[in-house]
Amino acid sequence: MSLQAPKGTKDLLPTESYKWQYLENKFRNIAADFGCREIRTPVFEYTELFQRGVGETTDVVQKEMYTFEDKAGRSITLKPEGTSPAVRAFVEGRLFNETQPTKMYYFTPVMRYENVQKGRLRQHHQFGIEIFGAKDASVDAEVISIPVGIYKELGVEGVELNINSIGCPKCRKTYNEALKKYLSKNYDKLCSTCKTRFDKNPLRILDCKVDTCKEIVKDAPIILDYICGECKEHFESLKNYLDVLNINYKIDPFIVRGLDYYSKTVFEFITDDITICAGGRYDYLIEEIGGPSMPAVGFGMGMERLLLTLQEKAIEIPEEAYVDLYLGNMGDKAKLEVLKLAKELRDRHIKCEIDHMGKSVKAQMKYANRIGAKYSMVLGEEELNTGKATIKKMEDGQQIEVDIKDMDTLIKVFK
């Protein structure tokens, strides 16, 4: 029996990697437009980071984390999300001592033990942005505008932005009391997980995926009716900023997000009933992880779900030729010259492929076509004697005679 990749994982083969590279370059450029710099964090962290940050009562911590003990008996978890590690790095690196705000972006694999289905894998990849140190709602609007810009640049239409405010610990306490009073009428119908959440963190019940619980919370009190004056003012400011930026949105009072660290603003981008990007404000997470009291806001965007969306909307990602010139050869002497010529061209960043398998010229040209080479050139005894060779443009068959010793003229063909 041949070995296979674990369930819920997927290999990224060379025939697909160009799509990822295209998107990653797009994201990097857009992140740079907003003054964000890249951060890279370990693929695993101490489990306590996610217990404290994400929350003990969340589905992520209770059901979905890949957790194990290392050889020293320490509890380690493969990271299930990108924000907590970024915050941990921000605190550990004492970046809070620098002039704020601090703006970061990242690409990271995240691992969750979930039911494998369309657009949902056990290892998927996130593009994320985190901004630390700014509390005004204008930065929330700026963060939201980044995915808006990404979808616009990629030509993705039909994406809906939903926003909500889940308040702060002060006003959430009042809401939790009202929510518990409402839920108590149907306590016996709650799933076992939500029964444990009832006293510890009733807000999490709104995020339950079990059908009976989803039905119960349909008529639950709306958190926007309970937020304090400060949180209400922040939410009104956010809406005003989004209006100024001409960003359309809907208010969804039942968005709470599946992670405990969120406060005030939460948002989701949805298309075809699938959430393809989500985020919000987390003004208390930095302090929870051991740093000073400092506001923050960010989002995570699933790469696999974005690629699925592009595919379903028939949006093609352009594939650039990854070989400028295929250098064919006829005979051992020509092969030596081809090796030397390829080195000189590569030293000047011309992407070259050569034959290492002793193929016939016909087979070499067939291979050049398969790899999408822009040009081809074959060296044989005649070309070595005259110092002249013909470069063929693979797209239309156009031919150009060149002096193979005149490197400057040769390179101009590819520029």
From Swiss-Prot:
Catalysed reactions, as listed in the record: tRNA(His) + L-histidine + ATP = L-histidyl-tRNA(His) + AMP + diphosphate + H(+)
Gene3D superfamilies in the cross-refs: Anticodon-binding domain (3.40.50.800), Bira Bifunctional Protein, Domain 2 (3.30.930.10)
Similarity comment text for this entry: Belongs to the class-II aminoacyl-tRNA synthetase family.
Pfam name, any one: tRNA-synt_His
Catalytic class of the enzyme: ligase
This protein's name: Histidine--tRNA ligase
Location of this chain's protein in the cell: Cytoplasm
NCBIfam families (UniProt xref): hisS (TIGR00442)
Subunit record text: Homodimer.
Lineage: Bacteria, Bacillati, Bacillota, Clostridia, Eubacteriales
Source organism of the structure: Clostridium botulinum (strain Kyoto / Type A2)
Gene encoding the protein: hisS
Broad class of where this protein is predominantly found: cytoplasm
EC number(s) reported in the record: 6.1.1.21
Highest taxon of the lineage: Bacteria
